[in-house]
Amino acid sequence: RVIAPALPGFGESYKIKSLNSINAMAKIVLKCIQEKKINKFNLMGHSMGGMVVQEIVKIAGDKVNKLICFATGSIGNIPDRFESLDVSIKRLKEDGIKETAKRIPPKWFVHGSKAKNYYLCENAAKETSEETAYNALNAMKNWNGLENLKNIKNETLIIWGDKDVSYNFNQVEMLNKNVPNSKLE
């Protein structure tokens, strides 16, 4: 079975108060897994979710069979991102959540808002509050998992696309070089 929890403040969990740290997000996902009485599981995370899964492995790595890190890195304040997180935070405050939700998600797709499945992101962002976006940006900015990479013993698949404008090759290569049992695709 597949369980895809929506982090507090996002998607179907938009009414729940959002969290402002990657560690707190990891703990809430682990709580969800524990409530479902799942002892061992495969784990996948994309972008900020990739930071969350790295933190989950740090907290409870013995419960994780295999790890998939998709378009993510080990440094939350993402080097060479299409714009710095500080700029994203500043623009969120100036432009508001509606404009930010129109501006940033298209960057996640090669064909922007014209991409076949873009509507899924667009729909998920509809209920996201400015506070949730602010908390998420700050959570990423303040997180750094670089020191823990060597401790990730789980078999790890790293997936990255060469058109990614958030995470450059140096970020994913850092994951691949420092996670002992990893493979980059």
Enumerate the predicted regions with their spans.
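Core-facing hydrophobic residues within beta-strands of well-ordered domains
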Residues: V64-N65, V179-S182
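Conserved alpha/beta-hydrolase "acid-adjacent" motif
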Residues: V165-Q171
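Conserved alpha/beta-hydrolase catalytic His-Asp/Glu region
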Residues: N77-E83, E94-N151
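Flexible "cap/lid" loop of the alpha/beta hydrolase fold
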Residues: Q54-I59, V64-D95, E99
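Gly/Ala-rich beta-loop-alpha elbow adjacent to hydrolase catalytic centers
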Residues: G45-G49, V53
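Active-site loop/oxyanion-hole signature of alpha/beta-hydrolase fold enzymes
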Residues: R1-M44
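Short beta-strand/loop motif that positions the catalytic acidic residue
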Residues: I152, I158-W160, D164
